[in-house]
């Protein structure tokens, strides 16, 4: 039994705790949008990065995130943590889907499509996670309530980006959708593999594997990142830290809860991204307040619908039978009450 199983399993099953931590994860991921833009400005002052430099930048971020995750968790456990030998291949598979494929196609797609469309399409990962979990891995049932909740949540993403939406389809859109599918698959895989491995260990090592691969590929194809700017390095460290915290926590939530109950909160990530970008980089945001409010209402409604199980029913008080002496079973001077086949009788020693 792992440390999390013994110490925190019950906590991470509490609906309120799940909601708060899931929202925290989404807020952290949402903050990545303005910080990535800030990092690009500081580390690529002559213009935006090319594709290979973007891959290198992301690879450094995630390799460092994995290292931070394992170091912090090892200090907490008072020993260096390694994955079980039989789980190395599984962690490699998660790295392929969650880090390498997802972020390669996501960043490539953003270079070929608008920011608004990229945000909307990336939000579809919740759809794919629930569909894959229900239809392919049979981890849970696909119900009408889940579909409706996803549609409402997705409508919230559309609402916050409606001014920048273009009704066309190109390769950039397809790449972002492919990245969303890859992220959905990784969520389901983490749920499966976490049965035999600590989800924090999975998160840390898959980041190191995936990030290292991206660094090698980006550098091999001519990618360059200027690490001489202190501000840029600070942004890179923050991005690594938020990935370490958010993905590790997300993995724990997936371990102890149905995929749909957790991934539905992913619809909040684009909303946080737009909100924080408007606050931190107002020159790059043209979102109207009314659109943001409508978006938040729709996303929260979708989350509530999926997690709402109905109002608690008031227990009915059954009338207690009366004994021969006129007392109820908990009264009288009988030593014990024996109830068999609906017949109540007194039995004395």
Model-derived features: positions:
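C-terminal-most transmembrane helix of multi-pass membrane proteins
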Residues: 2-12, 62, 162, 267-349
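Specific transmembrane alpha-helical segments of multi-pass solute transporters/efflux pumps
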Residues: 74-116, 159-161, 240-257
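Membrane-interface helix-cap regions at the ends of transmembrane helices
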Residues: 2-5, 38, 42, 65-83, ...
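Juxtamembrane helix-entry segments on the extracytoplasmic side of multipass membrane proteins
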Residues: 14-19, 50-55, 83-89, 162-182, ...
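Hydrophobic/small/kink-forming positions within alpha-helical transmembrane segments
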Residues: 27-30, 34, 63, 95-100, ...
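Loop-to-transmembrane alpha-helix entry segments
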Residues: 119-122, 138-159, 169-173, 230, ...
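Helix-helix packing/entry segments at the starts of transmembrane helices
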Residues: 24, 60, 99, 103, ...
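Juxtamembrane helix-loop-helix junctions in multi-pass membrane proteins
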Residues: 27-65, 185-209, 257-259
